[in-house]
Regions:
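Gly/Ser-rich "nucleophile elbow"/oxyanion-hole loop immediately N-terminal to the catalytic nucleophile
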Residues: 144-188
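Histidine-bearing beta->alpha loop at or near hydrolase active sites
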Residues: 293, 298-316
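Short beta-strand element of the alpha/beta-hydrolase
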Residues: 73-77, 83-94, 114
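Cap/lid segment of the alpha/beta-hydrolase catalytic domain
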Residues: 99, 105-106, 112-163
């Protein structure tokens, strides 16, 4: 597959000016400071389910997210732990739901607690979801989520999703079997963008692992991506002439390249140079702007699948070293 974007050496040097939107920090402080207002339960609920796996305990999770509305997930924990566990909180790719409880077990098998967040309103691709997005979308929105609530940051879909994600991390910080100082967030594509946003919104994380992250330098992605979801924005603007400035202003509050400038936790990025869904220059933008210590794995001949199982092995080693000693992996400086 040919490269879908700038060549690697140009991506390494690519540092566009991305002005932060006005009131960015105040917007997010206000969003996260809002109290739940729909009468939902004010604490997480965990119901153990039998997956037929005696070495792993699995819980059907319901955590109050945006506006206190319940967001579902799975929590996997190794049996027999005698001390608080390190924890990996995972956010999912575009269209994917939490799936079945026995599907994602790698992190629990490695000895960590593993919390998977069901992305509200999603779950039609690869794995089913069960969490609805009850907030109405904007009239005339393109099918998908990038233009849902596009009129303003206050109504946009990802305001709700990012808030849900922060609440999932907060839930693990007070879980009696989790070490609050050893929480890592991760995700692929959309999940990688969410992980970067959480890294900028939640201080004190142990680590961040964004893979081929979506929602980075969104304005560029909308102009050069060959495949969805960024193409949703172009489809919307083909019909709604004169709204370009307003659309990209709204989306700028959810651009992970901005949130990356607020992050401080160590990070392990992956970028695929033949990615037509999340063009590599958009991912490099977030990587270069990331304010914490960072490492990068580049998969020069891969598309949106990224490093696949090879990169999972890189992540396992990185988290092990993060929790038990100084990192030993290859580091690329910005």
């Amino acid at each position: 597959m040919p490269s879908a974007d700038l060549p690697l050496e140009e991506c390494r040097a690519y540092r566009p000016e991305l002005p932060l939107p006005g009131g960015f920090d105040a917007f997010w402080a206000g969003t996260l400071g809002e109290a739940p207002h729909d009468g939902a339960a004010d604490k997480p609920r965990y119901r153990e389910v039998d997956c037929g796996l005696p070495r792993i305990r699995t819980y059907d999770v319901s955590i109050p997210g945006y506006a206190g509305r319940p967001v579902r997930g799975w929590l996997h924990m190794p049996t027999g732990a005698t001390e608080p566990l390190g924890c990996v909180v995972e956010f999912l790719g575009y269209g994917r739901g939490r799936g079945l409880p026995h599907e994602e077990l790698m992190w629990a098998c490695a000895g960590y607690a593993h919390l998977v967040m069901d992305t509200r309103g999603q779950g039609w691709s690869a794995a089913a979801g069960v969490t609805p997005d009850t907030d109405p979308g904007a009239a005339g929105a393109v099918p998908g989520f990038l233009t849902r609530g596009i009129e303003s940051p206050e109504t946009h879909y990802y305001r709700r999703v990012f808030t849900d994600a922060v609440r999932f991390v907060e839930a693990m910080r007070v879980h009696p079997e989790v070490d609050p100082a050893r929480i890592v967030v991760t995700g692929v594509s959309q999940g990688g963008g969410i992980a970067l946003a959480v890294a900028g919104l939640v201080p004190g994380l142990a680590g961040v692992m964004p893979d081929v992250p979506f929602l980075c330098h969104i304005a560029r992605g909308a102009r050069i991506a060959g495949l969805p979801p960024y193409t949703e924005i172009a489809s919307y603007l083909r019909l709604h002439h004169g709204r370009t400035e307003q659309v990209f202003r709204t989306l700028s509050y959810f651009d992970a390249a901005h949130h990356a400038t607020r992050a401080t936790a160590p990070a392990l990025f992956s970028i695929a140079m033949a990615d037509e869904i999340c063009p590599p220059s958009t991912c490099f933008t977030a990587y270069h702007r990331y304010a914490g210590r960072k490492e990068l794995r580049v998969y020069e001949f891969n598309g949106h699948e990224g490093g696949g199982a090879h990169h999972r092995a890189e992540q396992l080693a990185w988290v092990r070293d993060l929790f038990t000693g100084p990192p030993t992996g290859r580091t690329e400086l910005s």
